[in-house]
């Protein structure tokens, strides 16, 4: 029998990048929906999937993407749009639910945010809850998972914790650092998303998912610091405006300002599991604790594991912050040679240089504040050095 076709929306995002390989390993056919398919070119699994260019904010692009689809994963958000994104998210969800119904899709699986709908919520968290409600308003059965902080290399919330903890020996923070969170390992999020495909107990339900324990946000940062061997102290500084925190996060982490602003605003309420029905509905999911998830994330801060999001088929030099590393990429066009990786452990962090026949890529994983200062102070020299190496066969 031909395996069912699974559509993954938000294919260039973090969750999709971890879900798609697991779907392929499980024998499913996968179609990836992306506004810009070029951003998928460098993924190891690109040649194993069907890629369709579409946009959930443009309803006329959806019928072709949904044709022949058995189950669709709804993994998109519009926080990067900035002002007005919440209305756009609801309109997109409504259009997607309608298009899925017309295409004969049998199941929608949605990953939303973990929060108490009865509390006063920031726009980001309220929108996540309302998006699920809109999807469930259609005729296609919807399984909704609500998750808080996702612990894994590349997760937006985890990268905020990582970079802020690495950067500041004394971490200032607003009062919401005392709020509670129940983080869940990325492996377990994917376990739940996969289990929903075949487990009939979950079809049509809303499930709050979290890890084994509850922590304050300050605890999460201190536990990360302990895993990294960093000494960190926290102090609360009430009255720090959200825009100021978001600006700092955007400057020092891979998270863009509009997303940082929305996420930080969402930290004003607790994010804990109050209804643990997922544990009974999906007993096949074995939960991993936060410390183990952090250790796994740190092990993935290595070129062997980092998603090549910068390989989009477009020539030119690229600079980015991604999955715990600063990355410089330069096309070389030497036309010959075999890829070589050089590694150097320095006082301020870990350096890797990948030398290929067509490009050179420098990875730097900083160790604490000295690592950040080293990178930024010597940033122009890193480019000069990489260009010099790029001219050598």
Task: State where each predicted segment sits.
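A conserved amphipathic terminal alpha-helix motif
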Residues: 374-393
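Beta-strand/loop substructures that line and gate deep hydrophobic ligand-binding cavities in soluble
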Residues: 348-380
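Substrate-positioning beta->alpha
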Residues: 92, 156-157, 176-197, 205
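NAD(P)H-binding glycine-rich loop region in Rossmannoid oxidoreductase-like domains
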Residues: 38-103, 113-117
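Glycine-/Pro-rich loop/turn segments that contact NAD(P) or position catalytic residues
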Residues: 78-167
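Glycine-rich "substrate-gating" loop/helix at the edge of Rossmann-like oxidoreductase active sites
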Residues: 148-154, 175-186, 210-213, 284
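Mid/C-terminal beta-alpha module of Rossmann-like enzyme folds, strongest
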Residues: 2-5, 195-262, 270-334
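N-terminal Rossmann NAD(P)H-binding glycine-rich loop of SDR-like oxidoreductase domains
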Residues: 3-28
């Amino acid at each position: 029998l031909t395996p069912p076709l699974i559509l993954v929306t938000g294919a260039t995002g973090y969750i999709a990048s971890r879900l798609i390989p697991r779907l392929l390993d499980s024998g499913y056919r996968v179609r990836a929906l992306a506004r810009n398919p070029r951003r998928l070119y460098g993924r190891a699994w690109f040649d194993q999937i069907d890629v369709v260019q579409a946009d959930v904010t443009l309803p006329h692009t959806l019928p072709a993407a949904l044709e022949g689809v058995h189950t669709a994963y709804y993994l998109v958000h519009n926080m990067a749009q900035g002002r007005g994104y919440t209305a756009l998210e609801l309109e997109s969800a409504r259009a997607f639910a309608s298009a899925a119904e017309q295409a004969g899709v049998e199941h929608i699986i949605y990953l939303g945010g973990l929060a108490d709908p009865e509390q006063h919520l920031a726009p980001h968290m309220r929108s996540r809850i309302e998006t699920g409600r809109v999807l469930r308003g259609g005729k296609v059965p919807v399984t909704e998972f609500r998750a808080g902080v996702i612990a894994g290399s590349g997760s937006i919330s985890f990268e905020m914790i990582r970079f802020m903890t690495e950067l500041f020996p004394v971490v200032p923070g607003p009062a919401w650092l005392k709020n509670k969170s129940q983080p869940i390992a990325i492996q377990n999020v994917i376990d739940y998303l996969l289990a929903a495909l075949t487990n009939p107990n979950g079809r049509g339900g809303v499930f709050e998912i979290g890890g084994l324990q509850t922590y304050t946000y300050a605890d999460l940062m201190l536990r990360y610091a302990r895993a990294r061997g960093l000494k960190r102290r926290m102090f609360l500084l009430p009255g720090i405006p959200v825009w100021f925190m978001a600006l700092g996060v955007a400057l020092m982490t891979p998270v863009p300002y509009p997303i940082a602003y929305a996420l930080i605003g969402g930290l004003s309420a607790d994010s804990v599991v109050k209804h643990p029905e997922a544990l009974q509905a999906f007993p096949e999911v074995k939960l991993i604790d936060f410390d183990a998830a952090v250790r796994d994330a740190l092990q993935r801060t290595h070129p062997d594991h980092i998603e090549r999001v910068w390989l989009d088929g477009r020539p030119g030099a690229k600079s980015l912050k991604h999955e715990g590393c600063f990355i410089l990429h330069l096309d070389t066009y030497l036309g010959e040679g075999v890829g070589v990786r050089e590694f150097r452990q320095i006082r301020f962090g870990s350096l890797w240089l990948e030398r290929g026949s067509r490009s050179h890529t420098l990875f730097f994983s900083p160790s604490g504040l000295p690592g950040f200062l080293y990178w930024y102070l010597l940033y122009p020299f890193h480019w000069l050095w990489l260009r010099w190496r790029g001219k050598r066969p």
